Regions:
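Conserved motor-region signature of P-loop NTPase helicases/translocases
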Residues: 1-72, 136, 144, 161, ...
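N-terminal accessory segments
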Residues: 1-34, 38-43, 52, 266-383, ...
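Core structural elements
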Residues: 101-114, 166-190, 343-348, 364-377, ...
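Conserved ATP-dependent motor core of P-loop NTPases, especially the RecA-like helicase ATPase domain
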Residues: 23-25, 62-65, 78-274, 364, ...
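Conserved NTP-binding/hydrolysis module of P-loop NTPases
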Residues: 71-79, 374, 378
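Conserved ATP-driven helicase/translocase motor core recognized via long
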Residues: 56, 177-364, 458, 546, ...
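ATP-hydrolysis module of ASCE/P-loop NTPase motor domains
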Residues: 98-105, 123-191, 301-323, 334, ...
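Conserved helicase/translocase P-loop NTPase motor core
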Residues: 107-113, 343-397, 410-411, 546-566
Length: 786
């Protein structure tokens, strides 16, 4: 029985239930805009009023920013409660909680793990003065460990087959990336090395294809599901065609259905040889050409079209599973097992060496924090007690987890070990789980969502009301996701319980604010450009960006009105009211440039284009030239850039001196053999100025090459900035502040690189090239804004 809701608290019945329910594990499925943060804060405040100190709660957030905002909200609420309360004892209690906020366990799971390790480091044999390894340092160390191991393995014949399988003539990135991915994925398991060692489990083979674990675990269930779906579709078509009175067409569908059913029976009986033979022997009959009444012809054509789609689906089953006989597949599985066995060995070796290397450096990464915490919490003392686990179970009166859909299995194990049987409070929305690439496991949420609905081990509360959006937005969203989201795609059935419901009824209902889908036709640039000004060279995505920019300007200048923050009056829309979602970050540069042309201010967060910025590509080219000046493309890029400032005519004039050497040698020869030439395109004054500029550049280049042998990369980069005044130069260009900040960031990245025990210009360049090759990037440096 939950208490009555206080009169001053604005909360829906379900929100109040989530705030006030006690004595059970709770899973709160909170849809977007449903007030989950408010529920979390109010529940914490209620715990405080019930006598629990704020530092007796563990509140796990997904980001440090969320933790900071949570603390600020609590601080504000407590200060407000102190002002309003006339009870001196209660005021003192709230004041005490304000003092406890800085030490409260409101943090990310990794920050909590850090605290556990700092307290119980001795239980896991960890040096207490360890330091954290950032992502870049981890990538560098990973590369170093792998290259050393790879070199050893390539000398051993037993690994030739596995290297050949994952590599090609151009690159061995295949096996490199596979080992990295296996390592990363294994770290989401409670026993990573055990998982890596068991890679071949599902590929064990005997004498019979049907009895292999791979077939039983993956092939058979998938085939049954796909064939059952086809049978259901054919049954539906037969119901429809029966009403049309077309017996010959119906007979064709019945024959199709018999064909599919025959294959399904063979699969259910694990007679894969017969299933294969059925595919080989039987063919689909041609669609009947019998005359039919004109009134049913259109319907029959629709059925025929659907049948063609089903035939393609059936043909794809053959291509996926029966393009070769089961006997040959068994032989292939034997080979796969052999290759996987060696791959497993390699992955375990890499795992051990990478962990050892981190241990030698006394470094931990985020994954290490989780696994070391798990070791500490499961460590038994001489009396068989989990002393760390019991300490936290006794200390925390409740364990609260925000964004529970983004927790992985290792994190879940940690949370279980610091919780009592019925003191967990989990909030999230499985529909918003987008961190699978970070190994989040939304099935954890789904398992509890289903179990708690039946009252097993806990209670489920659904917050479906959305207070952030208009009914038109929510109705459109529901219409889309009811068609596409289910347990297989999205981890939850998008039923009436999961559907979004309108919570904010204050929006005016007399305006037409229907959701829109805008279809932009491709412009035929060969025939006409009337529909799009300056259309030549446009890509499809650019057309879309232009349309969005025009629509924003139209709404700004109309002006379009929206509700104010208090939802009690309307105001004209401003640029900050618009958000743009793009399917890929590669569009960010285009959005920025096109919006700038329309005079629209835009803030693109973490545009992954740092290494594409002109000032950065110039500096990277210069570092390549310092490492090896006999590289034509980087050298010409530097000479053409603002660092030297040559134009195309000057570059061509230099090349006329020596056409068959490297460009660097041509530059040197141009200076050493200099004499004025009588050419129309370059007068004597320009030629002398060119010689002086090149001499100045070569003097600096030689100086920088000497510095590269004696200084750190960061010192070298700063020396270049000082010698060339490049920072001042870029500051004077468009978007100059951002350009200068990016150059400062390059200096910081170089300093960070070398602090990781990695040295040398060439290695730094290789690191940058590796990031670019893997389509990774460093974030563009942020500018302080108002």
């Amino acid at each position: 029985m939950i208490p009555e809701k206080p009169k001053g608290l604005q909360a829906t019945p379900d929100q109040w239930k989530a705030i006030a329910t006690r004595g059970n594990n709770l899973l709160v499925s909170a849809s977007a805009g449903s007030g989950k943060t408010k529920v979390l804060v109010e529940r914490i405040l209620m715990h405080i009023q019930e006598g629990i100190d704020i530092n007796e709660l563990l509140v796990v957030t997904f980001t440090e920013l969320a933790a900071k905002e949570m603390k600020e909200r609590l601080r504000s609420k407590l200060e407000e409660a102190i002002e309003k309360s006339t009870d001196e004892v209660l005021q003192q209690r709230f004041s005490k909680q304000l003092q406890l906020i800085p030490s409260a366990m409101i943090s990310t799971i990794h920050s909590f793990c850090m605290k556990v390790i700092r307290r119980y480091f001795y239980l896991a044999g960890i040096d207490p003065v360890f330091t954290m390894m950032d992502e870049i340092e981890g990538q560098l160390l990973q590369e170093k460990v792998w290259r050393a191991l790879e070199e050893e393995l390539l000398e051993q014949p037993e690994y030739e087959e596995v290297f050949a399988t994952f590599s090609n003539d151009r690159s061995d990135d295949g096996i490199t990336n596979t080992v990295y991915h296996l390592y990363q994925y294994s770290r989401s398991k409670r026993e990573p090395k055990t998982w890596l060692s068991n890679l071949t489990q599902n590929y064990a083979v005997g004498t019979d294809y049907a009895s292999t674990p791979f077939v039983k675990t993956y092939v058979k269930p998938a085939l049954i599901e796909e064939l059952t779906y086809l049978i259901a579709q054919y049954n539906q078509l037969l119901k429809e065609i029966e009403l049309l009175g077309a017996p010959k067409h119906q007979a064709v569908l019945e024959d199709d259905l018999d064909f599919v059913k025959a294959v399904l029976v063979h699969i259910q009986e694990e007679s894969y040889v017969f299933a294969y033979q059925t595919f080989e022997d039987r063919k689909f009959k041609n669609w009947s050409t019998a005359k039919v009444d004109e009134t049913v012809k259109e319907s029959l054509d629709e059925i025929k079209a659907i049948r063609e789609g089903l035939k393609k689906d059936f043909q794809k089953i053959k291509e996926d599973y029966f393009v070769i006989s089961p006997e040959v597949q068994l032989q292939q599985l034997t080979k796969v097992n052999r290759i996987l066995s060696k791959l497993s060995d390699i992955a375990v070796m890499f795992y051990d060496r990478f962990q050892d290397e981190k241990h030698q450096l006394n470094k931990l990464d985020f994954s290490d924090l989780e696994h070391d915490t798990l070791r500490i919490l499961t460590k038994l003392d001489q009396n068989g007690l989990k002393i760390a686990s019991e300490y936290y179970q006794n200390h925390f009166k409740e364990v609260m987890v925000d964004e529970y859909q983004d927790v992985n299995r290792v994190q879940e194990a940690i949370l279980e070990l610091v919780s009592k049987p019925v003191n967990r409070f989990m909030v999230g929305d499985v529909k918003q789980s987008i961190y699978g690439f970070r190994l989040a496991d939304p099935s954890l949420f789904r398992e509890k969502y289903e179990a708690y609905a039946e009252g097993k081990s806990g209670e489920r509360i659904v917050l479906a009301e959305n207070f952030r959006s208009r009914d038109e937005v929510l109705s459109f969203t529901n219409k889309v996701f009811q068609q596409i989201m289910n347990k297989e795609l999205g981890q939850v059935e998008y039923d009436d319980v999961a559907a979004l419901k309108t919570g904010n009824l204050s929006y005016s209902q007399d305006d037409d604010k229907s959701s829109e889908i805008i279809l932009i036709e491709d412009v035929d640039l060969d025939e006409s450009t009337d529909d799009l000004e300056d259309a030549e060279g446009f890509e499809k995505v650019e057309n879309e960006i232009h349309y969005v920019a025009q629509r924003i300007q139209e709404m700004i200048h109309t002006p379009f009105e929206v509700m104010n923050d208090n939802a009690d009056a309307k105001r004209p829309v401003n640029y900050g009211d618009f958000a743009i979602l793009s399917s890929t970050k590669s569009n960010n540069d285009k959005i920025e440039s096109i919006f700038a042309a329309y005079g629209i201010p835009v803030n693109v967060q973490k545009a992954q284009s740092y290494f594409k910025r002109t000032e950065i590509t110039t500096m990277v080219s210069l570092l390549k030239v310092i490492d090896n000046p006999l590289q034509d493309i980087p050298l010409v890029a530097v000479l053409r850039s603002g660092l030297v400032g040559l134009d195309e005519i000057a570059l061509a004039h230099i090349r006329t001196t020596s056409k068959n050497t490297s460009y660097y040698e041509a530059v040197c020869q141009f200076i050493s053999d200099f004499k004025l030439k009588d050419v129309d395109y370059y007068d004597s004054k320009q030629q002398l100025a060119l010689k002086e500029r090149l001499e100045g550049f070569l003097t600096l280049l030689n100086k920088w090459r000497d510095s590269a042998n004696n200084e750190s990369i960061a010192q070298l980069i700063w020396e270049i900035y000082m010698d060339t005044h490049y920072l001042e130069y870029v500051h004077g260009q468009s978007n100059g502040t951002q350009r200068a900040v990016n150059l400062h960031a390059l200096y910081e990245h170089a300093h960070q690189y070398e602090s990781s025990s990695f040295k040398g210009v060439r290695n730094f360049i290789r690191f940058i090239e590796a990031l670019q090759k893997k389509e990774k990037d460093l974030d563009e440096a942020p500018i302080a804004t108002d």
